[in-house]
Structure formats: C-alpha cells, structure tokens
Amino acid sequence: GFLSALKKYLPIVLKHV
C-alpha cells in the first residue's frame, strides 16, 4: 500500500536530505 511504501522510502529520503 501507499503507507507501506512511504514508511519504506521516507527514511531513505531523509538520509539524502
């Protein structure tokens, strides 16, 4: 689901910021 993808990619995005 969308939330599953969000939880999966959000930490990755935060690391790149």
UniProtKB/Swiss-Prot annotation:
Keyword Secreted: yes
Main localization, broad class: secreted
Residues that bear Valine amide: 17
Keyword entries, A-Z: Amidation, Antibiotic, Antimicrobial, Cytolysis, Fungicide, Hemolysis, Secreted, Toxin
Domain of life per record: Eukaryota
Post-translational modification as stated in the protein's UniProt record: C-terminal amidation is important for activity, since the non-amidated peptide shows weaker hemolytic, antibacterial and antifungal activities.
Subcellular locations according to the entry: Secreted
UniProt-recorded Gene Ontology molecular function terms: toxin activity
Gene Ontology annotations for the cellular component aspect, listed alphabetically: extracellular region
Tissue expression: Expressed by the venom gland.
Gene Ontology process terms (BP): defense response to bacterium; defense response to fungus; killing of cells of another organism
Stated role: Synthetic peptide exhibits hemolytic activities (less than melittin) and inhibits bacterial (M.luteus and E.coli) and fungal (F.oxysporum) growth at micromolar concentrations. In the context of inflammation and cancer tests, is weakly cytotoxic to normal cells, induces calcium signaling but does not impact cAMP production. In addition, prevents LPS-induced nitric oxid (NO) synthesis but does not affect the IP3 signaling and pro-inflammatory activation of endothelial cells. Does not show significant antiproliferative activity on the breast cancer cell line MDA-MB-231.
Protein family according to the UniProt entry: Belongs to the xylopin-like family.
Identification of the protein by name: Osmin
